[in-house]
């Protein structure tokens, strides 16, 4: 690869991948590697600059140290949160526990510097930022000056202008920091001098070559769910190896309404991809009977998928690889980032739900891409825009949208309710004519295994409850609940209650992420 590159050393922050996303938004190629990446590998990577991520640990813990030789490479370095503390500690400054943790919004007063010049928010020389730290730099290393402070953090930003070393105690990668993108662009484009040459067509060329090299003449099986991730993965792999790819479409009884027909029409008939359609509803439902724990459900669904693939593998002479549409947010939510130092939230079906004795090797061509990049890739590969920009759908399907035990009755009710919700979102527009489906990033219905009392006509009902969930997000790492019009919510509720026999109450989820996750399980 001849284009300019930025290296991100990951110390285990839950939002480290957002740094990579922001850098790529500037069309500069970057890679995220573990903080303990050997110095000779860093030199071989030949980055234009290095970004040190945040992390949950202390600089005084010996297990969380990068090679300090990075400070002798003669290239710009930006330390974020823990990365700033690591920089200060190893260059002769001091880091101490703060008297109080600083978490959330803060206003930083800035001093003119190469990093901050011309970047400000509503008032001169101030930045509205997002803090999340306990320790802080208490004494500057030699050669550094303060370029930003808050009342509780006198050294919130620091620089060594001569060496082009910068430290910031807040997180520019999250959307809560208003000028975060501008600060990162200043570092990457201006200070590091990286040229913006990374695009999806370039990525396709590199990814295709990598898949061909990795797979060789082996055959590959991919579980095609109809979701964006698996669909784009299928198109990319098919571009690379053609008929060596066989997609297995598993109907586990937990798909959206008419999902099976849509998938077969698109891939088998229109794109010429080999697709095996497996009806495994009975197998999955039997295994899930009586199981209420969401982690167990995820692992059961993952294990059953492998059983299905094993059965199909026996029919394919050279099948060696299982392809998946795993993307960055899947990995970070499972604490599966390359450092494995992030604090775990929950397992993901593409990461933690696979049995250790899986017989196939894993092929994950989208593992380093964010959702918006996956969509951009899908369009570049020629997939229909309406498919590529379809809302995300989890691999376990409705299995993680039915709280508690999964039953066919529940799945049938939820399918109908969810379809009504999506129909109304597509058919309702804002004042600019944009549908609420396009205005929201993800929307779906959740089945609650509780009954409530209702009245229909002259009779009393005692039926189930569904919750509606709609969020707006740029990265799926954080999300805000969508403020849907009351009239839209009213129509959805009326239709579900009147058209879906067995549901008599509809509620709307107004939780953000954090503290909630987007999916309920």
From Swiss-Prot:
InterPro entries: Class_I_gatase-like, GATASE, GMP_synth_C, GMP_synth_GATase, GMP_synthase, GMPS_ATP_PPase_dom, NAD/GMP_synthase, Rossmann-like_a/b/a_fold. GO terms for cellular component: cytosol. The active site is at residues 81, 171, 173. The keyword Nucleotide-binding applies. GO terms for molecular function: ATP binding; GMP synthase activity. Keywords: ATP-binding, Glutamine amidotransferase, GMP biosynthesis, Ligase, Nucleotide-binding, Purine biosynthesis. The keyword ATP-binding applies. ATP binds at residues 225-231. Residues 5-197 form the Glutamine amidotransferase type-1 domain. Residues 198-390 form the GMPS ATP-PPase domain. PROSITE patterns: GATASE_TYPE_1, GMPS_ATP_PPASE. CDD domains: GATase1_GMP_Synthase, GMP_synthase_C. It catalyses: XMP + L-glutamine + ATP + H2O = GMP + L-glutamate + AMP + diphosphate + 2 H(+). Its EC number is 6.3.5.2. Pathway: Purine metabolism; GMP biosynthesis; GMP from XMP (L-Gln route): step 1/1. Homodimer. HAMAP family: GMP_synthase. Catalyzes the synthesis of GMP from XMP. This is GMP synthase [glutamine-hydrolyzing]. It comes from Neisseria meningitidis serogroup A / serotype 4A (strain DSM 15465 / Z2491).
